[in-house]
Swiss-Prot record:
Record field: transmembrane: none
Designated name of the protein: SH2B adapter protein 3
Keywords (A to Z) from UniProt: Phosphoprotein, SH2 domain
Role played: Links T-cell receptor activation signal to phospholipase C-gamma-1, GRB2 and phosphatidylinositol 3-kinase.
Length: 368
């Protein structure tokens, strides 16, 4: 009985979220713990430990009040090797955010690296991305687009046409815009695309899967109140583009396809377009409406600079006007086509399920 009574009065041990007071001289300046409350109401910063919890003995002082709190110095213990290093995790609630709801800033930190480019389609689905790159079948081998990943927030996917089939390659972007694709690292997504324009995409299946980026899908917002229409059936050739499109578009050679599915006009452009400024992310137009260096003087025999991967795309208003003019002239030839895939192509209309297929399986599919 006496033992039980003494057990009730033993000092209780509990964990303390604040390990060391701010005035502890043993704690290095670079490892100061975070305060439990910072700034005005609404800015709440909480910290907790994962792994070992440090005990805090609270003995009774005079008149039954809590006495001085003793907390062992975790820095000295970690240096001596008695305990494993601690990992401190912080949770930050911004003003207006409900407590307990974690914000996902991954997309917000990396979207601005891609949102200015015409080949970035944002949060479209895998099936929609596969449809866009499969529109021309095997003829659009190497056509690509970049989109946000559906299953992994903050990551991106390169969807491209491989011999008429849509394949998906995951991209990882850092907060500084650096890009990683499998074992390859690039300073930016632009450098990655330029690399895959010159070198095959690493699918590890030899020459049968040799694919280089040859064109990209451009999405232009459709004018409000207009119903989507098919602009061309078999694609716009270079001759028709020179006669039916404005001066800046007459310079395009080998335009693959121009359609308007869903709620937006979709244009597939090859890489032989005028230069696209990869750093500023917007086109440069001269006073005559033609890209700099691609006017009449450049067409008379001057040597053009090496081909670039990103090129001039006009403003959405100008491109919408040109597409509208092209619709009026080619609507008669588009009545007998609804762009439905045939039975052989319809089986490959969707993307490769919900999970990313291993590269070895992609190689086997390509060899079939």
């Amino acid at each position: 009985m006496a033992g039980r009574t003494q057990g009730k009065h033993r000092p209780r041990v509990r964990t303390c979220p604040s390990l060391v007071p701010f005035d502890n001289p043993c704690w290095p300046p670079s490892h100061q713990p975070l305060p439990l409350q910072v700034g005005a109401p609404g800015h709440r910063v909480t910290s907790f430990l994962s792994g070992r919890a440090w005990p805090s003995y609270i003995p009774k002082g005079k008149h039954g009040l809590p006495g001085p709190r003793y907390v062992p110095d975790p820095w000295s213990l970690g240096v001596l090797g008695h305990v494993a290093p601690l990992r401190v995790t912080t949770t930050i609630f911004l003003p207006g955010a409900s407590p307990g709801v974690m914000l996902d800033p991954a997309c917000q930190k990396t979207d601005h690296f891609l949102s200015c480019y015409p080949w970035f389609h944002g949060p479209i689905s895998r099936v929609r991305a596969a449809q866009l790159v499969q529109l021309q079948g095997p003829d659009a081998h190497g056509v690509f687009l970049v989109r946000q990943s559906e299953s992994r927030r903050g990551e991106y996917v390169l969807t491209f046409n491989l011999q008429g089939r849509a394949k998906h390659l995951r991209l990882v972007l850092t907060e500084r815009g650096q890009c990683r694709v499998q074992h390859l690292h690039f300073p930016s997504v632009v450098d990655m695309l330029r690399h895959f324009q010159r070198s095959p995409i690493p699918l590890e299946c030899g020459a049968a899967c040799d694919v280089r980026l040859s064109g990209y899908v451009v999405v232009v917002s459709q004018a409000p109140g207009r119903k989507p229409k098919v602009v061309s059936r078999g694609g716009v050739t270079a001759s028709t583009a020179r006669t039916k499109l404005p001066s800046w578009l007459r310079l395009l050679h080998g335009v693959i396809h121009v359609i308007s599915p869903g709620s937006s006009n979709t244009v597939l452009f090859p890489f032989s377009l005028p230069h696209w400024d990869s750093e500023l992310g917007h086109p440069h137009l001269s006073s005559a409406g033609c890209p700099p260096g691609h006017g009449a003087e450049a067409l008379r025999g001057q040597v053009t600079p090496p081909e670039q991967i990103f090129h001039l795309v006009p403003s959405p208003e100008e491109l919408a006007n040109s597409l509208r003019q092209l619709e009026l002239e080619s609507v008669s030839s588009a009545r007998d086509s609804d762009y439905e895939m045939d039975s052989s192509s319809r089986s490959h209309l969707r993307a490769i399920d919900n999970q990313y297929t291993p590269l070895s399986q992609l190689c086997r599919e390509a060899n079939l």
